[in-house]
Each structure stands twice: as C-alpha cells, then as structure tokens.
Amino acid sequence: MNPSPSVTELQVENVTFTPSVQPPGSTKSHFLGGAGERGLEIEGKFVKFTAIGVYLEDDAVPLLAGKWKGKTAEELTESVEFFRDVVTGPFEKFMKVTMILPLTGAQYSEKVAENCIAIWKFFGIYTDAEAKAIEKFTEVFKDEIFPPGSSILFTQSPGSLTISFSKDGSIPKDGVAVIESNLLSEAVLESMIGKNGVSPAAKKSLAERLSALLNVTSDKMK
C-alpha cells in the first residue's frame, strides 16, 4: 500500500471537497484528484447545477506514473487516453456530486443514463446486460429529491458501482445500492471526465493536480 498523496481541499462555489475520504463500501483511503462544476448555457448565461469531486485510491498515482509521469497539465487535459486510463485503471474511484441547485432523483438519473448509453453505443458495447444495469440505476433514484447541499456518492470498484446519498455533507459507511456492472461503473465516471464529459472544469482540475503528483513521483524514482 502506498502512502496518501499530499493534496489540498478544493472549493467549488460554496461546496468544499476534503483532501481525502474513505468511500462507502470501501476499506481504502482515497485522495481528491480534482473538482469542478457541471453547468449548462441557458439563455446566454452559464447556470451551475452540481459540484463534482473525483477521488482516486492512493495506489492510483504509482499505477498511472509509468505512462504519464513528466506530462504537463495541458498535455493531460488534452489527452482522451489519459482520462480513459483514469476511468479504467485497476484502482478504486469515488465521485461526490453535490447539488448547487435542487434536482430530483429522476432528473439526475435520466440524464446520467442517457450519457452512459451514448458512451456504450459509441464503443459498440450496449447489450441487454447494460440495459438491465441502467434500469437498476434509475430505480435507485426514482423517489429521491436532492436539495442544495445534498450529495450523490458513487464508489467505483472493479466490477461494481456502490451508490450512496448524503443530505448533510457527511460520508456514510455503506451504500444504499450496489450494482454489479463494470461497464456501468466506468461509464458513470466517463460521463463526467471522458471525451464528452459534463464537467470540463473537473477534468482540468484533475489533470493539473495529477500532473503535479505524477511529477513528484517521477522525481522520487530518479
């Protein structure tokens, strides 16, 4: 096990993302890789809906370093392959999505489901198994309401996605549902930071912070 990388907290609007967490359903420590808002242009104005924090298991840095150390933040930001390696890498990830504006569970899950299906169709891997996983995913959210400050939490483990909810910023120990689907688990994160990810700000933040951490790792290995 590698020591936790030394990182700072991040603020997105009035949401604070702590430097490290132990996600629901995991026994491992995760550090804050990056964070940013998700918003849409509405009538000429950028409206922010959620703040997204992406955490990575501590082992992620040495696992990514072999291929990506020495790259600048700009190079990582522009690299589709880098973000695919983050999404598909053999380490846990944790995503905390905190509401800036209120959303219903149906509004949130339907948009995520739509993005996941688009990703699978792009890769040519949308089958009945994925359709069933999406059904389970939307079912978990159907009766939920998320006021500002409440959070949706995703723990991405190899082969499964643990979903949790928090109304007060705390991190629960266990999830409300576990969906056994590696492709769904990866697609949820891909929809945030992938090629057409919904949060360019979180992607940029992740690239900047990981570039610095990977270069520290590179210096230590010299």
Swiss-Prot record:
GO terms for molecular function: chalcone isomerase activity. It is an enzyme of class 5 (isomerase). One of its GO terms (biological process) is flavonoid biosynthetic process. Pathway: Secondary metabolite biosynthesis; flavonoid biosynthesis. Pfam families: Chalcone. Expressed in leaves, flowers and fruits. It catalyses: a chalcone = a flavanone. Substrate binds at T50, N115, S191. InterPro entries: CFI, Chalcone_isomerase, Chalcone_isomerase_3-sand, Chalcone_isomerase_bundle_sf, Chalcone_isomerase_sf. The record marks Y108 as: Important for catalytic activity. Its EC number is 5.5.1.6. The keyword Transport does not apply. Keywords: Flavonoid biosynthesis, Isomerase. Catalyzes the intramolecular cyclization of bicyclic chalcones into tricyclic (S)-flavanones. Responsible for the isomerization of 4,2',4',6'-tetrahydroxychalcone (also termed chalcone) into naringenin. Part of the biosynthetic pathway for all classes of flavonoids, a large class of secondary plant metabolites, many of which are brightly colored. Belongs to the chalcone isomerase family. This is Chalcone--flavanone isomerase. The lineage of its organism: Eukaryota, Viridiplantae, Streptophyta, Embryophyta, Tracheophyta.
